[in-house]
Swiss-Prot record:
It is a single-pass membrane protein. This is ATP synthase subunit b. Its main location: membrane. Keywords: ATP synthesis, Cell membrane, CF(0), Hydrogen ion transport, Ion transport, Membrane, Transmembrane, Transmembrane helix, Transport. Pfam families: ATP-synt_B. It comes from the Bacteria. GO terms for cellular component: plasma membrane; proton-transporting ATP synthase complex. One of its GO terms (molecular function) is proton-transporting ATP synthase activity, rotational mechanism. It comes from Chloroflexus aurantiacus (strain ATCC 29366 / DSM 635 / J-10-fl). F(1)F(0) ATP synthase produces ATP from ADP in the presence of a proton or sodium gradient. F-type ATPases consist of two structural domains, F(1) containing the extramembraneous catalytic core and F(0) containing the membrane proton channel, linked together by a central stalk and a peripheral stalk. During catalysis, ATP synthesis in the catalytic domain of F(1) is coupled via a rotary mechanism of the central stalk subunits to proton translocation.
Length: 164
């Protein structure tokens, strides 16, 4: 070895120094660095798991939100349909009430017209009876007796009823 220019004691001392340096570096640097790298890897994996959990929770929250929105829309549509149905029922009730009121007013008008017709007919009969009596009195020149007067009125009214 000396022929190569290598001093064997120096070589052994340097080899021992190198091995000692490797042992010291391994004990002082390699293990802490490896522990640091392992810890970092563990934290990264944990962060990835946490991110995946958050993503799943977000997806679940989104599904819940969409389901709630769909439920709210259905509820709103149901409320609108119920309101429309109630409006139709109220409309039908109002129309029926208006028809009943119109029919009642029509019947009242018809009854009043019938009463007015009867009253006018009664007045007309009375006036005609008076006119017949007056005319008969003038034509005959004398006042009819009460009995004859009543018979003449009845006959005139019967003739008038036959015309109507």
């Amino acid at each position: 070895m000396e022929a190569l220019g290598i001093n064997p004691t120096l070589f052994i001392a340097q080899l021992i120094n190198f091995l000692l340096l490797i042992f010291i570096l391994r004990a002082l640097l390699y293990r802490p660095v490896m522990n640091l790298l392992n810890e970092r890897t563990r934290r990264i994996e944990e962060s990835v798991r946490d991110a995946e959990k958050v993503r799943e929770q977000l997806a679940n929250a989104r599904r819940d939100y969409e389901a709630e929105i769909a439920r709210a829309r259905q509820e709103a549509a149901k409320i609108v349909a119920q309101a429309q149905e109630r409006a139709k029922q109220q409309e039908a009730e109002i129309i029926a009430q208006a028809r009943r009121e119109a029919e009642r007013l029509k019947e009242e008008a018809r009854a009043q017209a019938e009463q007015e017709r009867i009253r006018m007919l009664s007045e007309a009969k009375s006036q005609i009876a008076d006119l017949v009596t007056l005319t008969a009195s003038r034509v005959l020149g004398a006042e009819l007796q009460a009995r004859g007067h009543d018979a003449l009125i009845a006959e005139s009214l019967a003739a008038l009823d036959r015309r109507n």
